[in-house]
A protein has these predicted regions:
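Membrane-water interface of transmembrane alpha-helices in multipass transporters/channels
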Residues: 1-7
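Conserved catalytic core of two-component sensor histidine kinases
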Residues: 8, 15, 148
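Cytosolic ends of transmembrane helices, especially the final helix of ABC transmembrane type-1 domains
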Residues: 14-41
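An intracellular "coupling" helix at the cytosolic face of ABC transporter transmembrane type-1 domains
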Residues: 23, 27-30, 46-47, 83-86
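Amphipathic, soluble alpha-helical interaction motifs
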Residues: 24, 31, 41-44, 275, ...
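Conserved E/DxxT/N motif and adjacent residues on the DHp alpha2 helix
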Residues: 40, 47, 170
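Two-component histidine kinase transmitter core
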Residues: 44-46, 125
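ABC-type nucleotide-binding domain
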Residues: 55-320
């Protein structure tokens, strides 16, 4: 009996390395798949090398059927439909016009299709039907790199990379000098904080975990400002951050709207009060559009959302 027990105990120790080998093999396969993606990224031409970029463009022309550069002008959606799955359409015939140099807002309850629409405009959600034109050029016919050179997207969870503040900001403008970096930080009211640390060499942990949510978002917007594109899409860029950061970001959006085309997607309607035009989505359909004043007076979908939010935000203030 003792011998059998000993064999059983030894057998468990014998098979343990085999089980570990299987786990290590799985990890190795994941690593190989990830390394392939990294190598493909490293093989992309570096901006600034004209000869390489021209060669890359020539190859891309052949691969994509001679796509076109991004136009500079209005962004127009006509009868826009989009589905993540074949039988589940998210956007149902949306029609919007974003005038060049305007401040346009897209609002609606959660799940109405706001972020899906912004992803279509950025070229991330492909396979739409209908028409989306940027400066007169159909979105599906525009080079992806040309689109990125003309439209900057800022979401609520923009990513900061491990390194330094300088490293992260230079991703927006690789040739920017320190003066431009400080200017961008000043615009988002982070310059004083960064100077109190180690300046532009201040360390940034993975995903910016050593900063608050509001600080991370401000750093991301500073990087976006350095990118300096004609169009900026703010997709819930002020959600889940402190009130002070939200107010500072909205001041910056208002300032940008004087020189850039701004598309602001927000669940908080107070942030879109000064928009030139507000589009209201419900379940993937456009139900209303107009200025804040016009929509409130219409007493429809927007007015209902506005009144509900105002009641919540003002609750208890009268008792103070």
């Amino acid at each position: 009996l003792g011998g059998c027990l000993l064999i059983i105990l030894l057998a468990a120790d014998f098979f343990l390395p085999m089980r570990q080998l299987g786990s290590f093999f799985h990890i190795a396969m994941n690593g190989m798949a990830a390394s392939e993606k990294i190598f493909k990224l490293l093989e992309l031409p570096e901006p600034g090398n004209t000869d390489v970029e021209n060669t890359y463009t020539d190859v891309k022309n052949v691969q994509t059927g001679a796509k076109k550069p991004c136009g500079d002008g209005d962004i127009i959606c006509r009868d826009l439909h989009y589905s993540y799955e074949k039988d589940r359409e998210i956007l149902h015939g949306v029609n919007i016009t974003v005038k060049k140099g305007s401040f346009t807002a897209i609002v609606g309850e959660s799940g109405c299709g706001k972020s899906t629409l912004s992803a279509v405009l950025m070229g991330r959600n492909k396979g739409y039907t209908g028409s989306v034109t940027v400066g007169g050029t159909e979105l599906s016919e525009i080079y992806e790199d040309s689109l990125m050179e003309n439209i900057t997207y800022i979401s609520h969870n923009s990513f900061l990379f491990k390194g330094s503040v300088r490293d992260n900001l230079l991703m927006g403008a690789p040739d920017a000098d320190d003066n431009k970096l400080w200017d961008a930080l000043k615009k988002v009211k982070l310059d004083a904080f960064v100077r109190e640390q180690q300046g532009l060499d201040t360390a940034v942990s993975e995903a910016g975990s050593n900063f608050s949510g509001g600080q991370r978002q401000r750093f991301s917007i500073a990087r976006a400002l350095l990118h300096d594109t004609p169009v900026y899409i703010f997709d819930e860029a002020t959600s889940n951050i402190d009130v002070e950061s939200e107010n500072d970001i909205m001041e910056l959006v208002a300032e940008l709207s004087g020189t850039k085309t701004i598309i602001l997607i927000s669940h908080r309607l107070a942030n879109v009060k000064n928009a030139d035009c507000i589009y209201v989505l419900r379940s993937g359909e456009l139900v209303e559009s107009g200025t804040h004043k016009e929509l409130v007076e219409k007493n429809g979908e927007f007015a209902g959302l506005w009144n509900a939010q105002q009641s919540l935000e003002n609750f208890g203030k009268g008792d103070r």
